[in-house]
Amino acid sequence: METLTSSSQSLISSPMSKKDYSSEIICAFDIGAKNPARTVLEVKDNSVRVLDISKLDWSSDWERRIAKDLSQYEYTTVLLERQPRRSPYVKFIYFIKGFLYHTSATKVICVSPVMSGNSYRDRKKRSVEAFFDWMDIFGLRDSVPDRRKLDDVADSFNLAMRYVLDKWNTNYTHYNRCKSRNYIKKM
């Protein structure tokens, strides 16, 4: 598991009162067996702090590994990339929802992928480019390992950042939404 160090960045210019927004720990998972990824962000006051960005491995003994990955932080919100109905990874979504159901007040939300349109390869390329842009903003670019397969990490990070920006009603040009605003769906 590779992890980036934490850093914080203020993303909005208009102040928000504590009544409007308190500290929140957001976790986003890009689901998969061999290449799942997790991003954990802390949103407090007017800033976002990257707590963790990790590549995970759920290829064997996945129940224990997912439980361990879920137990590392006290999440307020867990975002899961929506999977097609017959995907073999749907079991991960149901396991995570079940694991968190009675143990915490964590909201578990299934969301559509951030990048849409064009080809699969183009979407992954745009996701990695947006991820690198954010790493520059957070001052973490040097912490990103040099590797070819960064799209899973990028996807999990972009899921989390889109959620934060949408809560703050802030636009970011890299995140092209579908025509409908129904990309968040509770399962």
Swiss-Prot record:
Pfam families (alphabetical): Pox_A22
Cofactor remark: Binds 1 Mg(2+) ion per subunit.
GO MF terms, alphabetically ordered: four-way junction DNA binding; magnesium ion binding; nuclease activity
EC number of this enzyme: 3.1.-.-
Gene Ontology terms: biological process: DNA recombination; DNA repair
Enzyme class: hydrolase
Key words of the record: DNA damage, DNA recombination, DNA repair, Hydrolase, Lipoprotein, Magnesium, Nuclease, Palmitate, Phosphoprotein
Cofactor (UniProt): Mg(2+)
Task of the protein: Plays a role in DNA replication by cleaving viral DNA concatamers to yield unit-length viral genomes. The concatamer junctions contain inverted repeat sequences that can be extruded as cruciforms, yielding Holliday junctions that A22 protein cleaves.
Family to which this protein belongs: Belongs to the RuvC family. Poxviruses-type subfamily.
Name of the protein this chain belongs to: Resolvase OPG149
Native organism taxonomy: Viruses, Varidnaviria, Bamfordvirae, Nucleocytoviricota, Pokkesviricetes
